[in-house]
Design a protein with these regions (language model features):
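Conserved N-terminal beta1-alpha1 strand-loop-helix module at the mouth
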Residues: 1-88, 143, 171
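Hydrophobic faces of well-ordered beta-strands that scaffold small-molecule active sites
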Residues: 4-10, 42-44, 69-73, 91-93, ...
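Active-site mouth loops of central-metabolism enzymes
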Residues: 9-27, 68-75, 102-110, 127-136, ...
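Glycine-rich phosphate-binding active-site loops on the catalytic face of alpha/beta enzymes
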Residues: 45, 92-100, 151-163, 209-228
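Alpha-helix-loop-beta-strand connector modules within alpha/beta enzyme cores
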Residues: 51-77, 109-131, 168-192, 235-240
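Catalytic cores of alpha/beta
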Residues: 77-86, 137-147, 192, 196-210
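C-terminal helical cap(s) of enzyme catalytic domains, especially alpha/beta-barrels
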Residues: 105, 164-169, 221-240
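Histidine/lysine/aspartate-rich catalytic loop segments that bind and position anionic ligands
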Residues: 129-182, 186
């Protein structure tokens, strides 16, 4: 089995910074420290409301980073323009609601389908690999293939919440396995993310065919107690 890549999402370093309106802690410093400690990529979400990562963060991190940058954006003209300018290695198109605390679910691929298809084509022509953040259902995976995405990122939030709340996750695990298998059969690169902890990442790493985990909130939270370097190394060991 090939190693699962670890993408470190540093959004919530910016959340802490913005809580006081100061210039620390530095998302760039977090990105470079993650890179130094064998993260395979860095993920940032440039939201329309700029509630954590902002345009300057994106510019500076992209210019300094040596490992791939995975930029999460909504399917809008503004974000398409920014992504085309910055040319990150990966772009993950995600749903976005202004009132949500965090991304609440996968993209509705039957909404704005024509725009999505044109957006994906432009981003791919600009040498970025494009991922769609979707629920683990077979219909959406087939639609992602039809839209000519390179990758899918499976939303693991429900599965992770079942584990956190000590409830049975067997049915959801089977659902995720079927979704991941179909993605691979269709030639899509399969990533997984949202709500992942040490425990849930360890269980999901048993599924053959996941190429990458993107982990942020829990990882940044644990780093308060153990440090960012140690937390990244622990995740690396768990998902190897």
């Amino acid at each position: 089995m090939s190693k699962i890549r670890l993408g470190v999402n540093i959004d919530h370093v910016a959340t802490v910074r913005n809580a006081r309106g100061v210039n620390y802690p530095s998302p760039l410093k977090a990105a470079l420290l993650a890179q130094q400690n064998k993260a395979d990529s860095i993920t940032i979400h440039l939201r329309e409301d700029r509630r954590h990562i902002n345009d300057l963060d994106l510019k500076v991190i992209k210019s300094k980073l040596k490992i791939p940058l995975n930029l999460e954006i909504a399917a809008t003209k503004e974000m398409l323009k920014i992504a085309l300018k910055r040319k990150p290695s990966f772009i993950c198109i995600v749903p976005e609601k202004r009132q949500e605390v965090t991304t609440e679910g996968g993209l509705n691929l039957r909404f704005k389908t024509n725009f999505l298809k044109k957006m994906i084509k432009k981003l791919k022509m600009n040498k970025s690999r494009v991922s769609l953040f979707i629920e683990p259902n077979l219909r959406d995976i087939k639609l992602a293939k039809d839209l000519q995405a390179d990758c899918i990122e499976i939303h693991t939030g429900k599965f992770c919440n079942l584990i956190i709340n000590k409830k049975s996750y067997v049915a959801e695990f089977k659902k995720l396995t079927k979704a991941i298998n179909l993605g691979n059969e269709l030639g899509l690169e399969v990533h997984a993310g949202h709500g992942l902890t040490y425990e849930s990442a360890k269980i999901l790493s048993r599924i053959t065919g996941i190429k990458e985990f993107n982990i942020g909130h829990f990882l940044i939270g644990e780093s308060i107690f153990d440090g960012l370097a140690k937390t990244i190394k622990k995740f690396r060991k768990i998902i190897k």
